[in-house]
Every structure is written in C-alpha cells, then in structure tokens.
C-alpha cells in the first residue's frame, strides 16, 4: 500500500535535490555526481517499501525539434531507471518515460520558463 508519507518523501527528495534536469545530466546524457545522491535515496525508499512502483518522467523545453526532445528525455529517463536496476531494484517496479516538451509547466518564451520545463518528475504507479 502506497501511503501519503511515501509520496511526501518523494516530493521531499525533489525539493532537496532539485527538479531541474541540468542538475542530473551533462550535455552527453551522463549522470552528474549530484544525481547519484538522489537516486541512492530512491533505492533506499524503494527497499523500505517493496510495493512501491515508480515512473521517472523527464521533460524538456520546446527548443529544438519535438522528435529530438522526445528522444533525449526518454534516454535520460532510461539512464536513471538503469541506475536503479543496477542497484537492485526490480525492473518491473520502474518505468522510464520521456515526455519531451509535451507537458510544459511554464511558458517557453524566456530562459526562466524554459528552465522550469526542463525537469525530472517522480510519479507513483498505482
């Protein structure tokens, strides 16, 4: 059973480590050192909660082509999921989802808006 405290812990992880994908990836879609800290926290959370299933969603802004943005976001989501699998989390408990620029949370007319749209989301799968 997934409880509100688990959801709150996921939200807290993102608040502590940030949601910007720039925090997690370099220009070659490799994880930055900061990403490992957050992902290791997710491993511990998932080990404590064996029923927890998680989607890692990666979003981009609208710069570049929609196809390229979708590809890079899916690649980044899969890189994060692969790390969790390599740390012992069963693949059936994880989903990697690249959204590209399809779900903006801000406008794309300024750098600050685009930066908000380039983000990582952790979503509980029911």
Feature locations, PLM:
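Periplasmic OmpA-like peptidoglycan-binding domain that tethers envelope proteins to the cell wall
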Residues: 29-36, 57-126
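Periplasmic peptidoglycan-binding/tethering modules of Gram-negative envelope proteins
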Residues: 1-53
């Amino acid at each position: 059973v997934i409880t509100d405290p688990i959801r709150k812990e996921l939200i807290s992880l993102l608040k502590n480590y940030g949601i910007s994908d720039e925090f997690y990836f370099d220009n070659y879609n490799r994880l930055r050192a900061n990403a490992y800290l957050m992902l290791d926290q997710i491993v511990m959370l998932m080990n404590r909660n064996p029923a927890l299933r998680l989607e890692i969603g990666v979003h981009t802004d609208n710069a570049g082509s929609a196809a390229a943005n979708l590809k890079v976001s899916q690649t980044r989501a899969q890189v994060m999921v692969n790390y969790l699998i390599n740390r012992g989390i069963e693949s059936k408990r994880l989903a990697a989802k690249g959204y590209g620029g399809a779900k903006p949370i801000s406008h794309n007319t300024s750098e600050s808006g685009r930066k908000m749209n380039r983000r990582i989301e952790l979503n509980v799968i029911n």
